């Protein structure tokens, strides 16, 4: 009778078994259901992306407000309690810009094109005039006239090479190519070297392909320009450390400039077509081989001159309304514990990959969670879905929200799961704080690879890398920054594909995604599956699936890497090694405790004393990440509280473990004084103390 009633499908069998042995299905049943083909449709994700990218929607624009309304109405249609949280933030827009090149004193200056061309049969030609003119957000208004000097990627080490070559950058206009480091640091490094202005071009070697480009191939067209922010801080620069609410306190423009987070010289982004023109005007020594461009590019020389660049930029700063959309699915057993999923919505232009591939996935996750609720699922902990605004300007929407809710979030958030560019191509990538490594890897074994149905994401992931599977969240590249680096929340960032050629240009549209990024939208579906599964495990498992042993091993490796940097100096790393050993012991102890609880005979989660025991254990697991923060922040960078993960001082995209130690080592190498090396030792002690605090928290002990 039992068997005769359930012969229709394996899913029906699983459902019946669950209902036979449990009053309601086990949470793992719902997790499997979340991944089933009946719960997801590529078409739904495609429709969301198409709708979100119909018009350019830069932060502060009417089009972006319409996109926010679409996200809000979609979440509400899924019966998710949702609201908009507005902030009133300083954003900048271009008013006037020009770039001319004088090649000789006799010839008239060449006006370099700053516009991006509409391509043939462009379906978005009718709204192309709504694309904001190419610019750098928060660039300094002004004019710079000077001999052009080629500075490669504009890194600190590139300027060292130029000094060795005898090339003086002071009083010149630096020509740099995009790549390797954050554009804001390209400008800041140019200023530090004495440049009076910076022009950054999209080099065909890195972005332009081999003679074919979009719409025929995935590569950046000759007129394509990567726009973006050159602000080096996080959040509204006029409200450092507090939320940009209506009529709040703001610091002055002079104080913003003194912060060091906004450039003090003008800059402009240009295409590789314009970059070639400037490069042909530069003489002097031939640049090193690794500084050269790709096939078809002119020979790259360093200058200075004889070409003279005349750069003019005028921008306006306005207080604009930005809108975060927040959806809440309240937990049943622990409503005061939050699992947060976040993605930003604003785009420099159409934003098909960056960021609305992620927004489409967020809405897909929301829809599947609604379907689970209709099947009877209720999360143990509260799930919060966040759609951020003004990320592109400097992580503004997420930062303002975290700053406004700092104490609540610091005491209640279990984890933050970020997806920015969900899909830009093939190949899964993940970064996280180390206690989440095991969870992400485990989830990847349960989701089918979208490009090879015979294997899982984990199978393709592990075969495509020779290094660590999971990266780290030290860079300031997306909305996880406020959660990890400011308040110390365990976090992860997930994506398919790495960098892509049309990044931050007007060619990042639905057509590009449909032709090259994800033609069948299977990668989008896979991101939604993995993102949602990790969230479900964090929301539903009685004992949080954190493993701090991964953290201890990661820190040990980082200290070993430090040894070469302080070799030959009177620097003691013993405090670090000792504190990490204690963390390792604490991690093993709590892992053993989790196993013993799960394996105990007659264990039931409904007993009050067991609930209290598990709650206390979970609090230790949740709060240990907070222990890696320090209220004093990093040296000269108060907002960054995390002593393990934060951006490099000279590259916002990059990072090393122990950023405070790394910064002081670089300074000590430059000054080479006893005091500067003493500062290095002080930072080592600070980190060691933080790791010791983490061990005590994990053990739940008082000394």
What are these regions (language model features)?
Residues 325, 341-395, 400, 531:
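Alpha-helical metal-binding/catalytic segments enriched in His/Glu/Asp
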């Amino acid at each position: 009778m039992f068997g005769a009633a359930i012969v229709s499908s394996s899913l029906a069998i699983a459902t019946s078994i669950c209902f036979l042995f449990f009053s309601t299905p086990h949470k793992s049943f719902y997790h499997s259901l979340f991944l089933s083909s009946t719960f997801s449709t590529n078409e739904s994700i495609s429709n969301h992306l198409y709708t979100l990218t119909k018009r350019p929607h830069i932060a502060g624009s009417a089009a972006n407000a319409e996109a926010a309304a679409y996200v809000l109405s979609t979440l509400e249609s899924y019966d998710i309690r949702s609201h908009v949280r507005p902030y009133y933030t300083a954003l900048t827009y271009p008013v006037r810009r020009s770039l001319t090149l004088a090649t000789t004193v006799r010839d008239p200056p060449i006006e370099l094109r700053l516009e991006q061309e509409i391509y043939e049969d462009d379906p978005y030609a009718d709204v192309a005039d709504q694309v904001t003119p190419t610019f750098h957000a928060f660039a300094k208004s002004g004019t710079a006239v000077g001999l052009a000097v080629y500075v490669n990627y504009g890194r600190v080490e590139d300027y060292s090479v130029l000094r060795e070559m005898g090339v003086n950058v002071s009083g010149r206009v630096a020509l740099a190519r995009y790549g390797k480091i954050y554009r804001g640091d390209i400008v800041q490094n140019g200023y530090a070297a004495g440049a009076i202005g910076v022009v950054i071009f999209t080099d065909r070697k890195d972005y332009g392909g081999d003679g074919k480009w979009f719409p025929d191939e995935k590569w950046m067209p000759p007129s394509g320009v990567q726009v973006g922010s050159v602000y080096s801080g996080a959040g509204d620069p006029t409200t450092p450390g507090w939320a940009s609410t209506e009529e709040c306190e703001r610091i002055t423009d002079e104080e913003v400039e003194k912060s060091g987070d906004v450039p003090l010289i003008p800059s402009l982004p240009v295409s590789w077509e314009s970059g070639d023109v400037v490069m042909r005007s530069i003489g002097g020594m031939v640049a090193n081989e690794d500084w050269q461009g790709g096939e078809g590019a002119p020979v790259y020389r360093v200058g200075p001159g004889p070409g003279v660049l005349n750069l003019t930029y005028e921008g306006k700063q306005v207080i604009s309304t930005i809108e975060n959309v927040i959806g809440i699915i309240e937990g049943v057993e622990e409503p005061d514990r939050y699992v947060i999923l976040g993605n930003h919505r604003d785009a420099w232009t159409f934003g098909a990959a960056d960021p609305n591939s992620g927004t489409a996935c967020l809405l897909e996750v929301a829809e599947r969670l609604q379907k689970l609720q209709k099947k009877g699922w209720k999360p143990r902990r509260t799930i919060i879905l966040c759609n951020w605004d003004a990320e592109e300007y400097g992580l503004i929407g997420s930062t303002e929200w975290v700053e406004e809710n700092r104490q609540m979030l610091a005491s209640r958030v279990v984890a933050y799961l970020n997806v920015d560019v969900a899909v830009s191509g093939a190949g899964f990538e993940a970064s996280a704080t180390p206690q989440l490594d095991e969870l992400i890897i485990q989830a990847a074994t349960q989701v089918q690879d979208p490009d090879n149905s015979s294997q899982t994401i984990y199978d393709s992931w592990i075969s495509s890398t020779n290094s660590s599977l999971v990266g780290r969240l030290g860079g300031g590249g997306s909305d996880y920054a406020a959660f990890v680096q400011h308040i110390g929340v365990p976090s992860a960032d997930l994506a398919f594909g790495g960098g892509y050629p049309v990044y931050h240009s007007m060619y990042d549209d639905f057509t590009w995604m449909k032709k090259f990024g994800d033609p069948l939208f299977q990668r989008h579906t896979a991101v939604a599956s993995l993102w949602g599964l990790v969230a479900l495990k964090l929301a539903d498992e009685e004992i949080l699936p954190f493993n701090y042993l991964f953290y201890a091993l990661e820190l040990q490796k980082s200290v070993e890497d430090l040894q070469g940097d302080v070799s030959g100096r009177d620097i003691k790393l013993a405090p670090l090694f000792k504190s990490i050993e204690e963390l390792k012991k604490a991690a093993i102890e709590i892992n053993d405790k989790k196993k013993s609880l799960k394996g105990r005979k007659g264990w039931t989660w409904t007993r009050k004393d067991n609930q209290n025991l598990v709650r206390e254990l979970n609090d230790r697991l949740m709060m240990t990440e907070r222990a890696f923060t320090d209220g004093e922040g990093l040296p000269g960078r108060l907002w960054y509280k995390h002593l393990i993960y934060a951006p490099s001082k000279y590259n916002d995209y990059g990072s090393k473990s122990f950023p405070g130690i790394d910064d002081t080592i670089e300074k000590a190498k430059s000054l080479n004084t006893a005091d500067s090396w003493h500062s290095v030792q002080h930072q080592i002690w600070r980190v060691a103390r933080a790791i010791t605090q983490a061990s005590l928290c994990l053990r739940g002990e008082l000394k």
